[in-house]
């Protein structure tokens, strides 16, 4: 084997030329103690609050408690692989996640890493999980509707783009189902090319079973909703710090749409579990406990998250981010600490009741306790016209139904009120994963409030509605199109609806 001296000297010369004299300096500390997902670290004197740190085995953490002689950090992973004396280094970055349209259709964990086995994420940019919410000047009042596809919501508790509407109720009352139906209902709007009508969806699953999240993703895929949705999952088996972080990760992804003139919708399912995870972290970090052992800043935990949902004005791109936080109550107790906090932060609440659910009223919305503080400004003119009287009639029905239990001899007007109320309640029922387009909701509610259902037996209302809407689609598609395009109920449309209803009532048996 011949050795060429010239070649060797050239290689050595190239290596010398490309030799970098600057050393890589990183500030390091040592683990003093570790346990329960918390590490106490000596050193790291210049670390920032909320900064990402890296342990020697590659596991990431976040510095939260900056004390005189040590740093308290939470660990985003298993603490069993970290031991006393391990070296920890600063990364110099505050926790950030990938954002952009490249995330649509993907399932990620609380740090934005893909967990769906579809390869790496193509992200246009990264964004900090903790940023300040928009101030007062960049905002605009809520005026565009979010069509949920649920008659009971769009008519009685309307949600506008940029609103925060709480979904609250006991376990197994259909809270997540309301949110998923809203996602599925965006399919037609998102299939078009008009960016102002599209609504990109983010679903944050906090502390749920993996099987539940898998079922959710399957449902969204089967209904064609996954292509415009992002799922952020911090499941029950994930460490508490990831369950605490996941909502902020989700809102950072949603803010990308809001800040770029698009519209986003985010669901936090559910914030009770995030508060529990934060309580666990705070107690282990030895922060002083308050009411129900939650830390003193648990209100700020949720307020700084929900304030990031906003409707921006024209100068800031006209985008919006709508939030539907979910809170689980215990035995219908809405006066507990976390429910009252979140009720006071949001712009209204949808209250779901176990009793209604078991009576077969689904979605199990208690119309009397549910309110939307800003949504009525976002309701379309057509829906306002038909839904104006339904609220009053249902309120009177609830009041009368309570009295009617005592007396059997009711006068004709009371009897009429009770009959109408029973049929309207029946009309607002809707099967899961079958959201209705806005124009069909208008036609359906129009039939109810104008007395066309009064002669129909209560148990036939659902059949009547299905038959009537099928008739409208096949023979009166132009009327539905007129309502959809104008978003108003003109005199011509009203007359056409009346004649169609009169004809259908005669043939219905």
Curated annotation (Swiss-Prot):
The lineage of its organism: Bacteria, Pseudomonadati, Pseudomonadota, Alphaproteobacteria, Sphingomonadales. It is found in: Cell inner membrane. The gene is atpA. The keyword RNA-binding does not apply. Keywords: ATP synthesis, ATP-binding, Cell inner membrane, Cell membrane, CF(1), Hydrogen ion transport, Ion transport, Membrane, Nucleotide-binding, Translocase, Transport. GO terms for cellular component: plasma membrane; proton-transporting ATP synthase complex. This is ATP synthase subunit alpha. Belongs to the ATPase alpha/beta chains family. The record marks 370 as: Required for activity. Disulfide bonds: none annotated. GO terms for molecular function: ADP binding; ATP binding; proton-transporting ATP synthase activity, rotational mechanism. It comes from the Bacteria. CDD domains: ATP-synt_F1_alpha_C (cd18113), ATP-synt_F1_alpha_N (cd18116), F1-ATPase_alpha_CD (cd01132). Its EC number is 7.1.2.2. ATP binds at residues 169-176. InterPro entries: ATP_synth_asu-like_sf (IPR023366), ATP_synth_asu_C (IPR000793), ATP_synth_asu_C_sf (IPR038376), ATP_synth_F1_a_nt-bd_dom (IPR033732), ATP_synth_F1_asu (IPR005294), ATPase_a/bsu_AS (IPR020003), ATPase_F1/V1/A1_a/bsu_N (IPR004100), ATPase_F1/V1/A1_a/bsu_N_sf (IPR036121). Produces ATP from ADP in the presence of a proton gradient across the membrane. The alpha chain is a regulatory subunit. It comes from Rhizorhabdus wittichii (strain DSM 6014 / CCUG 31198 / JCM 15750 / NBRC 105917 / EY 4224 / RW1) (Sphingomonas wittichii).
